[in-house]
Amino acid sequence: MAKVVAFSSNKGGVLKTSLSVNVAGVLAAHDKHTLIIDMDNQGNVATSFGKDPDDIDFTIYDLLTDVDSLKRVNDAIYNVAPNLDMIVANDDMAYFEIDVLTDPKSYPDYFDLLKRVVQKVEKEYEFIIIDTPPAMGLIAANIFNAVQDVVIPFQPEQYAFRSLVKTIAAINKFNENNPDLRVADVVPTKVRDTNLHRAFLDAAKNYTKTQNIPFSQCEIRDTVKYGEMTARLSIPITLIDGVTKTLAPYKMVFENLVKELGYIK
């Protein structure tokens, strides 16, 4: 059975997709058969691999909203690298909550829609990575009901600290529905060497300590370099061979994070 991991925060722009695709890249490079499921209507997982999500007709939305589509779930799975597949999201996911909540007869178990998809494919993979939208609605509930581990990206700023607290609270509430759910790590992202950032990092570390939640030693620095290379080469940095001396430290951060999580040795 696959280990199912979500990168989740109700704040946007904190590198959820970058973490998702690069952690998946590390796992794939270590011969771990991995699937990325995109649950965000922006479709950034697909674009990370040079694909236009609007060119893909059969997506996670179809698998979530049409039980018959699960019979051909393999048609929604796209191979993007050795040991690495993805299921794409696009703008259709923007209508997911409205479509489901306005049709309760068709979706009586509306918290279980993603879990149903995961159960269909989990025997084929060692890891399933889920990229999430910056919201705490029905999509987040489906994600929390389907995963074991949640990794929370934390940008050390005022609004992000508030978001961290609320995300942890939402996960704690959902433990009744999913006893296997846990916050596996909080990962600092977009970190700069300023007193303000260090103050918010210290505050976040102190808060997570009170919640018995790990706070990562791996910091994702505030830089555009690896984002630019991903965009130029249409592949996450952890899947790029022969990176430059400038980019090698960023690749190593993701490698160390996956080791810290205990997913590889």
State where each predicted segment sits.
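P-loop NTP-binding core
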Residues: M1-K265
